[in-house]
Curated annotation (Swiss-Prot):
EC number: 3.1.1.61, 3.5.1.44
Subcellular location per the Swiss-Prot or TrEMBL entry: Cytoplasm
Post-translational modification: Phosphorylated by CheA. Phosphorylation of the N-terminal regulatory domain activates the methylesterase activity.
Entry's family note: Belongs to the CheB family.
Naturally occurring in which organism (per UniProt): Bordetella bronchiseptica (strain ATCC BAA-588 / NCTC 13252 / RB50)
SMART domains: REC (SM00448)
Protein name as annotated: Protein-glutamate methylesterase/protein-glutamine glutaminase
Keyword Ubl conjugation found: no
Modified residues (4-aspartylphosphate): D56
Length: 350
């Protein structure tokens, strides 16, 4: 079996050692070299031609973002960022994903050894996914011109429900940016740790015509608003309070190894919204959301999955398609327009 070759770049000797220990404990991957900074890494990339690079965000001599930008321009390769679990770390990591990084892992604030060892399987899964991922061009700057709804949107009954994981931050941006300000409400679960989703929501809000915010427990769901499930500590559910849709945040156990879980959101939308919803499953590894999308379809919702060619990781959409959960399989660049087309369709299903 050919092993995945990994180069670890981090200014901390402790983190380099722990990442090496974790990666080498899995039989399908190995650390071929480590580097304390990007300048050393540059020479080691030429020497070892690694399959995946793990890259610390903040380092001396050249920071991780500057190096990533140069790397993606001159020698694109799969990169997993290693980020601090802080608000600043979240903002920098989101920028790294815009520049082309595949995914990220977070360093615990305290007890780095125990924290990283605890997430050994998560780190290995992200490296495996990165080794198979499709590289994409960095995100263009600026705003996309909003599309128009094909028919005036007046009903607060209609909803769009979205789930994503690896590669999802950029896929979500591409879906939301063209949508007009009078779009129906949109609820999104993206696999992210605590502290990162607020920065993500703020970044999207600055780029989009719709209002994007991190969801709060008990708040009423309004048209023209996008609600992002808070990362790490709760699941987001859609519920009803009289004639209104409301958001519920529940601190229960992870589902499909994730909290928030896409399946939890999709199942709740099937029950609360039925045929008034559109369900969309985007790029990501694993199967979270596949069963929930099928539940939405059976409840009368229109459903779609991102196609393989445009996915960074074709995991969650593939599982949904295999279950028969997707009414249609759509390239990422066309999903916004397909959503608006479905919203303009007549009939009991949106």
């Amino acid at each position: 079996m050919k092993k995945i070759k990994v180069l670890c770049v981090d200014d901390s000797a402790l983190v380099r050692g722990l990442m090496t220990e974790i990666i080498n404990s899995h039989p399908d991957m190995e650390v071929v070299a480590t580097a304390p900074d990007p300048l050393v890494a540059r020479e080691l990339i030429k020497k070892h031609n690694p399959d995946v690079l793990t890259l610390d965000v903040e380092m001396p001599r050249m920071d991780g973002l500057d190096f990533l930008e140069k790397l993606m321009r001159l020698r694109p390769m799969p990169v997993v960022m290693v980020s601090s679990l802080t608000e600043r770390g979240g903002e920098i990591t989101l920028r790294a994903l815009e520049l082309g990084a595949i995914d990220f892992v977070t360093k615990p604030k305290l007890g780095i050894r125990d924290g990283l060892i605890e997430y050994s399987e998560v780190i290995a899964d992200k490296i495996r996914a990165a080794s198979r991922a499709r590289l994409r061009a960095p995100a263009p700057a600026g705003h996309a011109a909003p599309l128009r709804l094909r028919s005036p949107f007046a009903s607060s009954e209609k909803l769009v429900i979205v789930g994503a994981s690896t590669g999802g931050t950029e896929a979500i941006r591409e879906v939301l940016q063209p949508l007009p300000a009078d779009s129906p409400a949109i609820l999104i679960t993206q696999h992210m740790p605590a502290g990162f989703t607020r920065s993500f929501a703020q970044r999207l809000d600055a780029l989009c015509a719709v209002t994007v915010r991190e969801a709060s427990d008990g708040e009423r769901v309004l048209p023209g608003h996008v609600y992002l499930a808070p990362g790490g500590e709760t699941h987001m559910r859609l519920g009803r309070s009289g004639a209104n849709y409301v958001i519920g945040l529940q601190a229960s156990e992870p589902v499909n190894r994730h909290r928030p879980s896409v399946d939890v959101l999709f199942h709740s939308a099937a029950e609360a919204a039925g045929g008034n919803a559109i369900g969309v499953i985007l790029t990501g590894m694993g199967k979270d959301g596949a069963a929930g999308l099928l539940a939405m379809k059976r409840a009368g919702a229109r459903t779609m999955a991102q196609d393989e060619a445009s996915c960074v990781v074709f995991g969650m959409p593939r599982e949904a398609i295999a279950l028969g959960a997707a009414d249609e399989v759509v390239p990422l660049a066309d999903i916004s327009e397909r959503i608006l087309t479905r919203l303009g369709d007549r009939g009991h299903r949106v």
